[in-house]
Amino acid sequence: MIILDQTIVNVALPSIQSDLGFSQSSLAWVINAYLIAFGGLLLLAGRLGDLIGRKRIFLTGLTLFTAASLLCGISQSQEMLIGARFVQGLGGSMTAAVILGMIVTMFTEPADQAKAIAVYSFVAASGGAIGLLAGGALTEAINWHWIFFVNIPIGVATGVAAIKLLKHEEGIGFEQSADVPGALLSVSSLMLLVYTIVETSTYGWGSLHTIGFGALAIALMVGFFVREATAKHPLMPLRIFESRNVTVANGVQALMVAGIFGMFFLGALYLQQVLGYDAVDVGLAFLPIALAIAALSLGVSARLITRFGAKNTLIPGLLVLPIGLAYFARAPIDANYLTDLFPAFLLLGIGAGLSFPSLMTLAMAGATQEDSGLASGLVNTTQQVGGALGLAVLATIATSRTDTLTAAGSSDAAALLGGFHVAWAIAAGLSAVAFLLAVTLLKPDHVAAAEVAQREEEVRVSRGLGSDPRQAEQPEFAYATDE
């Protein structure tokens, strides 16, 4: 529901603009209000799940998201819709931030955990394609209000199931005090960073607005890390970055989603503005990506991760992704779907279907149990910031190249396609860099698992809990070795 909402709205924007009288610049805030709230609260929400209980945070976020969806659906003014979208982003971030943390604490057996993460990864990775199709179908069949109303029964059903099925947990508590300065610095820096990125389409990268707000966001982020390094009870213990796999997996994900998000956004524009597809056709065109992700995430990746390890499953996926993007970067002005587009979409689906479950497994397996909510929030934050930054950069590059070609006398379609080609080629390059980082920097699964077991033991001893005899038997995140 939350993943779909990030793309389902895109297809309905023309109808929303017509009904509510948005200008082209103000229309962007239907998307930006959600992104700023969603990206800004993820890290804090993930950590709050560790501290006061993930089920509590999940249900609070789900309630906010569902209620805000109702407000979005009944909106009759620009201000009401933008405000409701901001609240929807807050609720979505609270729910999304703790999901992976709940998975790794509920499913402690490696095989079960791999299956659960694979299901989550399918939803996260294929949501973009499914959202485009659902948005087009609902907007054309009924009206744009229903892209929000559809969330309400899903949200209610999910809430009832969560209350009945999820185990209650108190969390580890705030110890002696809450890190209020850390929380304020975290939320303000991330919200400001996402705001700066999404507004580059209006102000440009070299403008005083972008440079000023970007510098302020970075300064606040530096202040946040300084605070966490010196606080007695930090909101985000920096020990999480002691795990190389946590750090590298998040970096690899940022590069990967930067390319994929750019491909979805610019690819949809290419299909509509160059090839003349309507909204439903765009969704159907991207459907092979979702189907390939489903086939691999739900049927194959979990078994591969359990058998060969997450790193060894990730590498082939990251190898296929840049090949798919490079193939897409040669799409002609009169493309035939079966020969020019379908192979690229199939390769992208295969690459994402192998990569997302593996990356999430690596990022979560590198964190201790008590930091699992924080690790979950970090994974989602990396995905949002990486995707927003990648989309902004690739869209700017595409626009610049299009303007150059238009000035040189190219037709509108040829100029647009020239811009898309450059952006997709850069997206392929980003994915190739992600592949190289994964190959050279990620540690084998069994090495990372042993390090986590050692850190958990050190935490137990430091708190006077004594040694955990289970550590002598097997670390919790024990996958097949990849030597």
Task: Describe the predicted segments one by one.
Residues I152-G171, V187-E199, L216-A231, A434-P444:
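C-terminal membrane-cytosol helix-exit motif in multi-pass small-molecule transporters
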Residues I3-A37, P181, G206-F213, A219-G223, ...:
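Transmembrane core module of solute transporters
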Residues I16-Q17, L48-G49, A134-I142, I197, ...:
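Interfacial helix-cap and linker-helix signal at transmembrane-aqueous boundaries
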Residues I2, I31-Y34, F38, F65, ...:
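Structural signature of transmembrane alpha-helices in multi-pass secondary transporters
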Residues G53-L62, Q76-M80, T95-I99, T105-A118, ...:
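C-terminal module of multi-pass small-molecule transporters
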Residues I36, L70-L71, F86, I147, ...:
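Hydrophobic residues within the alpha-helical transmembrane core of Major Facilitator Superfamily
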Residues M1-K164, G299, F308, L314, ...:
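Transmembrane-helix bundle of Major Facilitator Superfamily
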Residues I172, L441-E483:
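Intrinsic disorder in cytosolic terminal tails and internal cytosolic loops
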